[in-house]
Amino acid sequence: MKITKIETHVLLVPDYDSAACSSAQDDIIVIVHTDEGLTGIGEVDTNPWVAEAMIHARGTHNLGLGLEEMLVGENPLNVEAIWEKLYIGSIMTGRRGLGICAIGAIDMALWDLRGKILGLPCWQMMGGARKTHVTAYASLLPVGSTPEEFTTSLCTKIKEAKRLGFRAAKIEAGVKGPYSHNGLQASDELVVDLTAACREAVGPDFALMVDVIYSWNNAKEALRTIHRLEPYDVYFVETPLQVDDHEGYAYLHDHSPIRIATGELQNTRFEFLDLLDRAKVDVVQPDIGRVGGLTEARRICDMAADRGRLVVPHCWKTGIGIAASAHLSFANAHCPYIEFLPALLSESGLRRDLVSEELQFVNGQIPLPHKPGLGIELNEEALERFRADRVVAALTR
C-alpha cells in the first residue's frame, strides 16, 4: 500500500469573531489517501490557510522539500519513519511553527490510517491501554463583554457541564492581557471572583482548573493572584505567563501553592525539554497537532513520565483532536485528564457538526474505544457547509 495524495479542507464558521479568543472558529482537515482506497483523517489548531500552503507547497531544494511531495509513494504503515523524513526534509521552512503544525495534522491522519489498515485502535498501537476510561474536563469559554456577563455565563456553563456528567471543568478567565476575551481589560480581582463563583456553583466534589491566557508579564505579579485562588481548590492554573518565560515559570513552580500548566503553543519535544527542565512546569499540555502529531506527543509523554510530571493534552478543536488526545491518554498512566470542548456548550458550529461519529462519552468519561484508528467519522455535509471559500464569498457579497 502506498500514499497517493493529501487532501486538505480549510473550514470557517460563518459567524466567526476575530475579537474572540477561540480557535474553534476555523480548522484544517487533512485526509491522507492510499492506492487501496483507505484514508486517514487529521486536523491541527493553527492558521488553516497557511498550514494548507505548507502541505502543498513545492520543494525547490533539499533543505525545503514539499511535504506532500515527500509523502506520495510512502508506505503509510511507516509512521515514525515518515515523521523523521518530513522533519528533516523541511528543516529550513519547517522545524518549528507552522511547518510542525502541518506535519502534526499529517501525522495524526497517518495514525488513523495505520489503525484502519491493521484493524487496531490507536491506543493499542501505542503499547496498550493503561486505563479503562479517560476523564474529560469541560473547557468553558464565557460569552459577553462585561465582568457581570462573564460571571453569569461561566456559572451557567459550569452548572450545565456538571449536569451533563462532567466531573471537572476549566474556566477561561482571560480578563486582561493581550488575549483577553472580547478586549476586556479587568483587574486581577475578577479572576478571583470568577473562580470563587464557579466553585460555589459546582460544589466541592468537582475538579476546577483556571486558564488566565497569558495574563501577567512577571511571575511575582502572577503569584499574588495565584495565592488568592488557593482556597477554591484549583487543580491547576494555566498559562499565567508568556510562552517563553522559562525563568518565570520556574519561579512559580518553586513558590506556587497550585500546579502550573502550560505548553499549548509549543512545538516538538525540543521545546518541551525546556518546559520540563528549565521552566519546571508541573503539568505539560501538548496540543497533539501543534507538537507534530501523535508520534511526537508520545515522546513528550515519555519525557514527562521520566521527570514525574503530568500530561494533560490541550485541544480546542473538534472530535478529531479530542479522539487523538483520548488515545494518547489511554496509553499513558500520567495523563489524568484531557481537554474537551463540549459540543452542547460550544458556540462553534464546527465543534458541533463536523464529526458525525465521535468517541463515546459517559458520565464525564470516555470509555476505551475499539474501532480502528481514531474511531471517528467526518460529517461530509458539514465539511462542505463550512468550506472557507464558500463562507468568505457569502460574507463579501
What would you call each of these model-derived segments?
Residues 1-41, 45-52, 345-352:
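Structured beta-strand/loop patches that form or line metal/cofactor-binding pockets in enzymes
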Residues 3, 37, 67, 106, ...:
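Conserved, mostly hydrophobic/aromatic
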Residues 33-117:
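Metal- or metallocofactor-binding catalytic centers and their adjacent structured scaffolds
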Residues 42, 136-138, 167-171, 208-212, ...:
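Hydrophobic faces of well-ordered beta-strands that scaffold small-molecule active sites
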Residues 107-147:
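Glycine-rich, aromatic-flanked loop segments that form ligand/cofactor-binding clefts
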Residues 133-250, 255:
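Metal-dependent enolase-superfamily TIM-barrel catalytic cores that perform enediolate-based chemistry
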Residues 227, 233, 244-365, 369-372:
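Shared catalytic-loop signature of beta/alpha-barrel
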Residues 372-397:
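Extended hydrophobic packing segments that form well-structured cores
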